[in-house]
């Protein structure tokens, strides 16, 4: 079969909503992140340390990161890493539409927009060196869930895929947990043909899959590190996640899940000039709860125990949708909370079942009024989703534009300092140029853009193509710290005064106004 015929056959076989979600997600991603894909950006405080990155993060428990990062180059090239990230999210969107059996093409497109523009994706793009690996991992985890749902013997491949995904980024396990919760709520509310026993069996299957996947993750981690206590660092408590200490802290961490959830559904944008409050999120959640209750009444009838179980799950939703606190209790940020997108997906699957709900309400007393209210609520929920997607997109691009300004500022600083070094009569071609101190230039993205000697060094080496003798930024940092303790450095003037540039040892040193070590 020719390639064009095979592709055409594949397109015909894929359900229209799945295809629509995948294609629209890719298009939305290209439009939303076009500026980031076509500009040189350093979005995170540590990005300058990772201009060259081989994906090896075994030291923080991410044993599969190097494999998934190998699809792109070892340099932070946004038009490669970012494009792979967008492809992964597009595939992920189509898979979730299949898992949730969304029938409406419109809602499939809306779900893909939510998944592509959610703040976790733009935050992931900020880590250019492994943005592709992070989202490829989320895609593999979603593929595991798809196999678990669609194939009778899908448990084993699902366990392996989720374990591999968790080995790239631990938050993938909680992302799958969040999507499982969305599917469970959908079946409990919208599917009267799925009885209580079937729901319990499915919940048990979900729990078994996650327990086995996380266990396999730790088994492989121990095997690859030799089981040594010092082989894995305690970054984000990865070594404590399976400990008795973490289990004992469950009540405190459970409360933390609720705090993290409400923070994640807080203001849509806090950037100056494009602030957007939290009202779209709160209105959407309120209408979502209303639609869940009315849909249950219409589709399930009088099932008080099942209704109470649904209310209990609604109360536990912040845990299931933001459970990363259980695995990383020290700190939670948007990079870890992709599972919170399930908040919006629950509303979308309820809207997808709205035709059946309205049909059932016709035969109920006061059903017509309730039906009109639900129809109006669906329009309001769609409007909230549009506002959310738009605000997330604008917020991301404002950050990208500020990052571009940061880059230009870095370039200007380094070019100035390099010119000072080369103008010094003691400068010899190939001498490392050490900028020691603090330029007092602070980015609004968490850390100063140029806050340590290794940042200047790395920028000069990789961005200005200066021939530097060291391969890593940490090596030059260690040498800078030794030079800082010398008498020659202490007696130097500070920039921009005369005498702020001097050869010390085999390095050309520029002393700034402040020292941060």
Give short role names for the model-derived ranges:
Residues 2-59, 63, 69-89, 99-112, ...:
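Intrinsically disordered, polar/acidic, low-complexity terminal segments
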Residues 58, 62, 85-87, 106-149, ...:
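Membrane-interface micro-motifs in multi-pass membrane enzymes
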Residues 94-109, 149-152, 298-302:
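Transmembrane alpha-helical segments of multipass membrane enzymes and assembly factors
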Residues 112-116, 301-326, 388:
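Transmembrane alpha-helix segments characteristic
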Residues 141-155, 187-194:
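Membrane-interface transmembrane helices that cradle and orient dolichyl/undecaprenyl
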Residues 154-171, 175-176, 181:
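Membrane-interface alpha helices of multi-pass inner-membrane proteins
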Residues 175-211:
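Perimembrane helix-loop-helix junctions
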Residues 263-266, 270-308:
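Hydrophobic, aromatic-rich transmembrane alpha-helices
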């Amino acid at each position: 079969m020719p390639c064009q015929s095979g592709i055409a056959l594949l397109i015909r076989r894929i359900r229209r909503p799945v295809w629509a979600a995948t294609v629209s997600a890719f298009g939305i991603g290209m439009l939303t992140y076009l500026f980031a894909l076509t500009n040189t950006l350093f979005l995170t405080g540590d990005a300058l340390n990772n201009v060259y990155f081989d994906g090896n993060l075994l030291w923080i428990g991410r044993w599969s990161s190097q494999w998934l990062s190998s699809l792109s180059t070892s340099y932070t090239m946004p038009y490669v890493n970012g494009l792979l990230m967008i492809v992964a999210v597009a595939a992920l969107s189509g898979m979730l539409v299949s898992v949730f059996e969304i029938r409406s093409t419109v809602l499939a497109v809306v779900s893909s927009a939510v998944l592509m523009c959610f703040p976790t994706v733009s935050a992931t793009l900020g880590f250019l060196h492994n943005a592709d690996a992070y989202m490829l991992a989320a895609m593999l985890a979603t593929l595991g869930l798809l196999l678990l749902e669609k194939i009778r013997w899908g448990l084993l491949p699902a366990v392996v895929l989720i374990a591999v995904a968790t080995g790239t980024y631990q938050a993938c396990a909680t992302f799958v947990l969040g999507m499982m919760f969305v599917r469970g709520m959908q079946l409990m509310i919208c599917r009267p043909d799925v009885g209580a026993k079937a729901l319990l069996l499915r919940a048990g299957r979900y729990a078994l899959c996650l327990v086995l996947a996380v266990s396999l993750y730790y088994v492989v981690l121990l095997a690859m590190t030799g089981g040594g206590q010092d082989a894995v660092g305690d970054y984000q408590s990865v070594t404590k996640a399976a400990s008795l200490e973490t289990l004992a802290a469950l009540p405190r961490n459970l409360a933390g899940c609720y705090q993290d959830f409400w923070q994640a559904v807080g203001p849509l944008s806090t950037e100056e000039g494009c602030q957007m409050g939290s009202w779209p999120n709160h209105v959407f959640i309120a209408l979502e709860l209303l639609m869940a209750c009315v849909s249950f009444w219409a589709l399930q009838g009088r099932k008080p125990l099942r209704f109470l179980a649904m209310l209990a799950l609604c109360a536990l939703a912040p845990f299931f949708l933001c459970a990363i606190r259980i695995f990383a209790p020290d700190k939670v940020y948007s990079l870890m909370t992709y599972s919170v997108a399930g908040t919006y997906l629950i509303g979308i699957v309820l809207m997808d079942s709205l035709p059946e709900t309205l049909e059932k309400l016709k035969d109920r007393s006061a059903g017509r009024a309730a039906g009109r209210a639900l129809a109006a609520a669906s329009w309001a929920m769609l409007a909230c989703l549009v506002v959310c997607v738009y605000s997330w997109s604008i917020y991301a691009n404002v950050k990208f534009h500020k990052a571009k300004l940061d880059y230009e500022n870095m370039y200007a600083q380094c070019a100035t300092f390099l010119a000072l070094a080369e103008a010094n009569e003691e400068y010899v071609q190939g001498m490392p140029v050490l900028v020691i101190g603090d330029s007092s230039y602070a980015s609004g993205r968490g850390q100063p853009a140029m806050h340590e000697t290794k940042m200047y060094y790395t920028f000069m080496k990789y961005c200005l193509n200066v021939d530097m003798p060291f391969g890593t930024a940490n090596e030059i940092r260690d040498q800078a710290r030794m030079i800082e303790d010398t008498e020659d450095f202490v007696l130097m003037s500070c920039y921009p005064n005369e005498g702020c540039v001097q050869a010390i040892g085999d390095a050309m040193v520029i002393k700034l106004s402040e020292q941060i070590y």
